Each structure stands twice: as C-alpha cells, then as structure tokens.
Amino acid sequence: MLFLLSPAKKLDYDTPVHVEHHTQPLFVEQSAALIKVLKTLSADDVAALMSLSPALAELNVARYAAWSRKFTQHNARQAVLAFNGDVYEGLQAGSLSPARLDWAQEHVAILSGLYGVLRPLDLMQPYRLEMGTRLATPKGKNLYEFWGSTIADYLNERLAGQKTPIVVNLASEEYFKSVDLKVLKARVVQCVFQDWKNGAWKVISFHAKRARGLMARYAIEHKVAKPEGLQKFDSEGYAFDASASSADKLVFRRKA
C-alpha cells in the first residue's frame, strides 16, 4: 500500500536535519528539462505565471539558476524534511525516528511538479513549481502533459508484486490529477476530512491539509498495511464516520 502526499510551497532548509540517510531523486532528467525551460523566464515572467510577488519571483529565478543535476547534502535535503506547509506541520517528520522514516521511504510518495515523485528521503533542491502551473514545454501546454503517464507507471512499478495494490490518496486534487488513472493498476482509496461548520459538514482546506499530514504520520507510526487499519485514526479530534464512508472513500469528521 502506498500513501500519496502533495508537496508544500513553504520550505525549510534551515532547521538541522536529524537523519543522515538520504537517496537520490528518481527523475533528474525530467527535472533538468523543466529547469531548462524555467531558466528562460525572467522574474516578471515567473511572477505572472505563478502569481508571485516580485521578491518571491526573484528568489525562484535564483533557485532555477543555482539548480544542479548533482544533489548533495550541501545543496539539497531530504524532501520530507524540506517541505514545511500545513500537511507537513501535521506530519512532523522532524520528530519521526530514523526507523520510522525508513518505513515511510517504502510506503509514502510525494507528488511534485518539478520532481514528479519524491520518496521521503530523496534529496531535493529548493524550488517553486506547482503541478497546476501552465508551463509550456516541448511535451505540451502544462505539467500534466509533461509528466504524462510517468507518475502512474512509477506507482505501478512500486506496487508490482503486491497481491492487492492499493494507493491511499492524501494528495490534493491538483496533484492527484498528475496520476493517469487509465494507466494506474491499483485500487484508489480516498481519505476525506470534514469539520462541522455553520450547521453542516465541510472540507475546510487548512484543516484538511493538516489532517492529511496527521493521517500520514498515523500510518507511519502504526505501519498500516490495509485501508481498514486507517479507520482507528483519531488525531486532533477526528473520528471515522462509517455511515458517510464507502470501501474506497474513508470519511473522518470532527466537531470543534
């Protein structure tokens, strides 16, 4: 069973990392091809394409210029420790033991606009390139066309040999769209997190993102091997709601 996560825009390359173990990213050739295109853009182009402030656009132009095919602990860090948005505040990878991070390495995959798929301990150089960005490349008009079936093919490889291949989707719609479902040979289980607001159950983006990270941590800590094992998830007040769920859609709810 593989758990899919979105990346984060917020990055942390300052906090000291607590593990030495790292691996090399898998799709460096594809990343290099994207960087080549990104290097042709001015800061104004980047600001317009990605709706960034001038300062953030300049920062990312500098990142693209500095990007190297060679990943070391000097220019990169493990992806799961570099990402720092809502999902990763829920996951809190910095407090996972090396043994638990090793389990995550085998069971978690992080989708990425620039890197395609990252394993948690893959080294990652800093970047900004969301999957929904309309970046034209020789392969098409956006990143979905650039990645094509690559991500689904990779997930199939990872799941090959498993009796019942299952992908647990903890990624956002923007990122999960990069997985070609016509190519993917696995059952997909969705996790939905809802909060009670104004008299109704609603998916509230900030809370749902954090909850996806909390669920990933729960799976890592409990070495969850079957979707049913996720039903006991109860972090930060969430509880499984069987009546709102189906076999492939697990709904977790909480009242404030």
Curated annotation (Swiss-Prot):
An individual GO BP term: response to hydroperoxide
Family: Belongs to the UPF0246 family.
Name by which UniProt lists this protein: UPF0246 protein Bpet1601
PANTHER family associated with the record: PEROXIDE STRESS RESISTANCE PROTEIN YAAA, PEROXIDE STRESS RESPONSE PROTEIN YAAA
One term under GO cellular component: cytosol
InterPro entries, alphabetized: YaaA (IPR005583)
Organism of origin: Bordetella petrii (strain ATCC BAA-461 / DSM 12804 / CCUG 43448)
A Pfam family it matches: H2O2_YaaD
